[in-house]
Amino acid sequence: AIAAIIIFLILFTIFGNALVILAVLTSRSLRAPQNLFLVSLAAADILVATLIIPFSLANELLGYWYFRRMWCKVYLALDVLFCTSSIVHLCAISLDRYWAVSRALEYNSKRTPRRIKCIILMVWLIAAVISLPSLVYKGDQGPQPSGAPQCNLNQETWYILASSIGSFFAPCLIMILVYLRIYLIAKRSHCRGPRAKGAPGKSKFKQSRQVPGGTLASAKVPNLAAHLVAAGETNGRSKPTGEKEMGETPEDSGTSTLPPSWPALPNSGQDQKEGICEASLEEEAEEEEEGEEEREEECEPQALPASPASACSPPLQQPQGSQVLATLRGQVLLGRAAGAASGQWWRRRTQLSREKRFTFVLAVVIGVFVLCWFPFFFSYSLGAICPQQCKVPHDLF
């Protein structure tokens, strides 16, 4: 029964990892450089299933090493090599996730296939260094039953502890710390949201909406009503185009006026009243980003200028990339600024969201993998620390 289960696991491992390699190599959407880690990891698992597990199963069922002595040394070295490579691959993937989440735009520009291949090569070199002593140094292999050749790893305490730390405990500690750091970054980003000071793409202008009274007004234009009211004085006289307002800020002086080709506001008379809403930019920006309902203040009726040209005289603050239109009913439409900084910020936000989802999936996979390996390495190390008092039963091991 145990042999049948092991054979099924061997076939399942080969088939599943072959599908992973085939999917990454054939699917255009999976040809990202970081997926090369999955190809190398799947190759290591296939090598474990084909070159290690069958011989381990035969050794357990027969009770002795049936094959040649030279193959025993190669088998032990490959066992440590492939298993260590599999674990260190997961450690490298976790570091790649951390760099992608903490430095999304900067790291993604450096995440080239050449760089990923160099990291994979380093992973295999680390695994080779850890597995080399079992090939060149025989050491103490423990008691050997008479007439029954055995194939065991070096039983010396220093080798057991060194190989266990290098193959499992050190990579496991790195993975735990890295994923803890990723969790803290995600939690801080979720609590802060896009409200970070100086975040690119945070525009002060928003698409206009209909307000009571049939008038369109922008909720994100600071002091819009003050500009329009100041333009039309009680005598109906408009200022010259190039003249500045009293108390005009330096920011206002650098902005341009509406082009003359745009439709002008109609002459609606001195007594015509329209509702123009004044809203605080800071309060509404905070409420919008915290997910709360946007608060609107009651509209105060203000007199529109009697002269059509007077509405175009005062300069409106218009950021680069925004749209300002004047309709036939005298309604001002302000579009959201869509500059390069805004696009960069949204690309970073999308990239972070995708990396966090992928990180969660990998955290589950790595967690299961660590739980499967921990009992073996714990009992293996425990037997070296206290071989007599803490001896683990052979069947359990």
From Swiss-Prot:
Marked site (Implicated in ligand binding) residue numbers: D79
Disulfide feature: C72-C151
Keyword line: Cell membrane, Disulfide bond, G-protein coupled receptor, Lipoprotein, Membrane, Palmitate, Receptor, Transducer, Transmembrane, Transmembrane helix
Chain positions covered by the region annotation Disordered: 193-212, 230-319
Compositionally biased region (Low complexity): 301-319
Signal peptide: none
Cited function: Alpha-2 adrenergic receptors mediate the catecholamine-induced inhibition of adenylate cyclase through the action of G proteins.
Record family assignment: Belongs to the G-protein coupled receptor 1 family. Adrenergic receptor subfamily. ADRA2B sub-subfamily.
The name this protein goes by in its record: Alpha-2B adrenergic receptor
Gene: ADRA2B
